[in-house]
Amino acid sequence: MGNEFQHRTVLLDEAVDALVTRPDGVYVDGTFGRGGHSRAVLARLGDAGRLIAFDKDPRAIETAESIEDARFEIVHDSFAAMKGALDARGVGRVSGVLLDLGVSSPQVDDPARGFSFRANGPLDMRMDPTRGESAAEWLARASVQELTEVIRDYGEERFAFQIAKAIVARRAESDRLGPLDSTGELAQIVGHVVKTREKGKDPATRTFQAIRIHVNQELADLQVVLEAALSLLEQGGRLVVISFHSLEDRIVKRFLQAHASAPAVDRRLPIRAADLPSPPLKLLGRMFPNDAEVAANPRARSAVMRIAERVAP
């Protein structure tokens, strides 16, 4: 496999520092990517430690399979399958779960993967190109209403309805023009609709993000894996999540806050707060890339890392 598309791991040392509390623990990397975090975790583990990583991308799996370490195992699946996969391996509790969300640089930079609006390629956008429906296939059948909702809700795009209508209008010309199946043409359609320019952002950014999230069911999978991680963490275990846009971070923030807060007590009921079960999580804060990291890797600028520890048995 070539190395033409390089990936810089964001918040590498900070994430591993927050995650690894026991060198003999069992850890999970929910998004192997190109292995930056996984290799750093393995470097911190002792002989009895163990790391189980997940990824949907076949190229990530190829990279992971080059790691010759008896303490490491890669699972070709979404992190949403984490609970079942660990149950199947006899793993009931883990010392830490790391989730580095979003798309990796090799996925974005390779036009053949269909994530990029900067270089023309097939309109795919699947993290795992061997499974599920591609972006082109979904765009070929989605209604104006469904397109509008996805682009509005997952892209926070105020021109969602106009973009949806333009996509459907282009689809009506398929007999003459052929199918809408290239990233370049989709970006062009969006560019004709979105006349305003956000500083440093291509007009197609929000629409491509929205379609990618929908095709890969990213937010639904995130909800599933957060619940799984909470159930898997041992007392003292850490959950570390790196998000790259507000939709992801909002879900993570609300989940962590909900499980780090004591339930409200109705003063009219004969129940003392001290009699209620303690919340399972303690929030350990959040971190952002420093100026030097952002200068070296501009894609890190939107990253936020949230850390929580399981305090209940």
Swiss-Prot record:
Q: What is its main location?
A: cytoplasm
Its EC top class is transferase
Cleaved signal peptide residues: none
Query: GO molecular function: any one?
Result: rRNA (cytosine-N4-)-methyltransferase activity
Give binding positions for S-adenosyl-L-methionine: G35, G36, H37, D55, F79, D100, Q107
One Gene Ontology biological process: rRNA base methylation
**Has UniProt tagged this entry with the keyword Cytoplasm?**
yes
Q: Which SUPFAM superfamilies match?
A: Putative methyltransferase TM0872, insert domain, S-adenosyl-L-methionine-dependent methyltransferases
UniProt catalytic activity? cytidine(1402) in 16S rRNA + S-adenosyl-L-methionine = N(4)-methylcytidine(1402) in 16S rRNA + S-adenosyl-L-homocysteine + H(+)
Please give the superkingdom of this protein's source.
Bacteria
Subcellular localization is given as: Cytoplasm
Query: What are its E.C. numbers?
Result: 2.1.1.199
- One cellular-component annotation, GO: cytoplasm
Q: Name one Pfam family in it.
A: Methyltransf_5
What are the entry keywords? Cytoplasm, Methyltransferase, rRNA processing, S-adenosyl-L-methionine, Transferase
What is this protein's function? Specifically methylates the N4 position of cytidine in position 1402 (C1402) of 16S rRNA.
Q: Which family does it belong to?
A: Belongs to the methyltransferase superfamily. RsmH family.
Protein name listed in UniProt: Ribosomal RNA small subunit methyltransferase H
Organism of provenance: Burkholderia pseudomallei (strain 1106a)
